[in-house]
Amino acid sequence: MNKIRKGDEVIVVTGKDKGKRGVVLAVGAEHVTVEGINLVKKHVKPNPMKGTTGGVEAKTMPLHISNVALVDANGKASRVGIKVEEGKKVRFLKTTGAVLSA
């Protein structure tokens, strides 16, 4: 069971974007892509076959999953734990103990 899932609101705890918040767009084995975080400029060639123009585009790159933490109700970073309730595994915030939706 992954501790961070698509759609979770996270905060960056280390790196150049430390303190910024965003919503998880994609989750990989060890990396997460967060909306508006870790933007890089990518130079794109024009491609008339696809109908794209060339130029410089901002692209969101993945972050390591250890560099982000979930945001609790108080707006602070929280670690995530996993416990069994009624025979099912559920995620909970370690700071508040609040159970996250399945």
Swiss-Prot record:
* UniProt keyword terms in alphabetical order: Ribonucleoprotein, Ribosomal protein, RNA-binding, rRNA-binding
The UniProt record lists the keyword rRNA-binding: yes
Q: Which SUPFAM superfamilies match?
A: Translation proteins SH3-like domain
For this chain, the annotated S-S bridges are none
Q: Which residues form a coiled coil?
A: none
| UniProt-listed Gene3D superfamilies | 2.30.30.30
InterPro entries recorded for this chain? Answer: Rib_uL2_dom2, Ribosomal_uL24, Ribosomal_uL24_CS, Ribosomal_uL24_KOW, Translation_prot_SH3-like_sf
Single Gene Ontology MF annotation: structural constituent of ribosome
Q: Which CDD domains match?
A: KOW_RPL26
Q: Which GO terms describe its cellular component?
A: ribonucleoprotein complex; ribosome
Q: Which Pfam families match?
A: ribosomal_L24
The record's Gene Ontology biological-process terms are: translation
Entries under HAMAP family matching the protein: Ribosomal_uL24_B
Q: Give the multimer and partner information.
A: Part of the 50S ribosomal subunit.
According to its UniProt entry, the function of this protein is described as:
One of two assembly initiator proteins, it binds directly to the 5'-end of the 23S rRNA, where it nucleates assembly of the 50S subunit.
Report the sequence similarity comment from the record.
Belongs to the universal ribosomal protein uL24 family.
Listed name of the protein: Large ribosomal subunit protein uL24
